[in-house]
A protein has these predicted regions:
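Jelly-roll (double-stranded beta-helix
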Residues: 1-199
């Protein structure tokens, strides 16, 4: 059984952070609290409006970050590593890492607890995806159509979020992305979470 949820702008929570504005797309559980760090996973997009900003301390969580438009220069003081992050490239790091970001952009974030393993990809027109993650997110960067095995054909508008939750981990989800206005830039961001069984 596959459960599908489609969320739009009215479902998202917008708030300020030290470097700009953040839009919370999804928080699990819905009764959780991001500020108190009481949640399993969180998907968000944010504007980075300062030339230099410091990432929030999210100790106990793992993070994936992707710029949706501009190149970022990241300094990870915890690992003494510099990264030049091109748009639509995922950057994996620990929530406890001390990171300074240089450059302004709009970014896409997935934060998740130790109970999950996360992935993130930028999706182009006519691309096919075959993934077995139990929880999958598709964030539309432009109007597009999503079709797939076990899925109805869905038209997503720019800024909408599609959440696909599968009960059977064994079955891979085959998804096809297409747009009436083909372009070079990615159509969507895909993110997936696999639940890690407790030992």
């Amino acid at each position: 059984m596959t459960h599908i949820t489609l969320l739009s702008a009215n479902d998202f929570q917008v708030s300020d952070w030290s470097g700009g504005k953040t839009k919370q797309l999804y928080l699990s559980p819905p009764t959780g609290h991001y500020g108190k760090r009481e949640f399993d996973y969180r998907l968000s997009t944010a504007t980075v409006e300062l030339a230099e900003s410091q990432f929030s301390d999210l100790s106990g969580f793992h993070r994936i970050l992707m710029s949706l438009d501009q190149t970022l220069h990241l300094h990870n003081a915890s690992r003494q590593k510099e990264t030049v992050l091109a748009p639509f490239t995922p950057y994996f790091f620990e929530g406890s890492d001390s990171i300074t970001s240089r450059g302004t952009c709009t970014d896409f974030n997935l934060i998740y607890s130790d109970h999950y393993q996360g992935q993130m990809l930028a999706i182009s027109d006519r691309e096919e995806l075959s993934q077995d993650e139990a929880i999958q997110f598709i964030y539309a960067l432009s109007d597009l159509m999503v079709t797939g095995t076990g899925l109805p054909s869905l038209n997503l508008e720019t800024g909408q979020l599609l959440i696909v939750e599968k009960e059977a981990q064994e079955t891979e989800l085959q998804i096809m992305f297409s747009s009436n206005q083909p372009k070079c830039a990615p159509l969507a961001i895909w993110a997936g979470l696999t639940h890690i069984p407790t030992k």
